[in-house]
């Protein structure tokens, strides 16, 4: 059984070695670079591919996978929208993901982001750096325990966030087209219209699908309370970024914490200090005084990295052994 790992990061390497030690019958080779048309020949001789792509792969890469008789592509992420399901299916290549590498990590990040927004952490830091230590109305805060928090998307991550928000005393409501009983321990289900119109903080936790694309847009923003705070630790494509910027400039949305952007692929995870951001919308989001932007790192904990490596390799080898795999995506 032979597997190859692409786009291996420094912090992932020890966990790959740890996994290999407990699976001596599996050959696992690694490359630090992402898989592209330029290095696709490196796939030859492998049955399983483990990747974490930030940019879509060229069609010829999928064709080469088929020519090499690759059996499975395992992504080390929960999201799989960057892979071409049509071409994978065409070449008989199965797809797996890591549906849950650390919901708690992302839930913690959502809570931390909401606290930074509602307690005006960025504004306070700006005043302090100017040695302005006055108590003043722009930094007067509302406690989360006196707020209603709306959770859009109540899967594993949404539930983790709801549990943490409830833990600080917030009234937590949620909406999901597929509600589940487990979530009711932490939140009360309401309609999407009610969630949008009554929440003081809205936290997004849905996957990127056709139905969720630009779910947050000019129309849905208009339904929200004036002065609402928005937290997105999900996928960038669930927000119409231009509509968000317009609403921030008009004061409809008081502040936003964004850990994802729809077209972030060319920029993360990279040092862009010497490279201009040519995407003007992205540049405005990053620089906006009422936006806390982070480069898709809500998940980024030691626990999550270990789970991403172990679970993706486990899924890959499970498929190669011909066994049922709970992490397989139906194509």
From Swiss-Prot:
Q: What is this protein called?
A: D-lactate dehydrogenase
Q: Which SUPFAM superfamilies match?
A: Formate/glycerate dehydrogenase catalytic domain-like, NAD(P)-binding Rossmann-fold domains
Give one Pfam family, short name only: 2-Hacid_dh
MF terms (GO), sorted A to Z: D-lactate dehydrogenase activity; NAD binding
Q: CDD domains of this UniProt entry?
A: LDH
Q: What is the lineage of its organism?
A: Bacteria, Pseudomonadati, Spirochaetota, Spirochaetia, Spirochaetales
Kindly state which reaction or reactions the protein catalyses.
(R)-lactate + NAD(+) = pyruvate + NADH + H(+)
Can you tell me which family this protein belongs to?
Belongs to the D-isomer specific 2-hydroxyacid dehydrogenase family.
Q: Which class of enzymes does this protein belong to?
A: oxidoreductase
Q: Where does NAD(+) bind?
A: 156-157, 176, 206-207, 233-235, 259
EC numbers listed for it are 1.1.1.28
Q: Fetch the InterPro entries from UniProt.
A: D-isomer_2_OHA_DH_cat_dom (IPR006139), D-isomer_DH_CS (IPR029753), D-isomer_DH_CS1 (IPR029752), D-isomer_DH_NAD-bd (IPR006140), NAD(P)-bd_dom_sf (IPR036291)
Q: Which UniProt keywords apply?
A: NAD, Oxidoreductase
Q: Which residues form the active site?
A: 235, 264, 296
Say which species the protein is native to.
Treponema pallidum (strain Nichols)
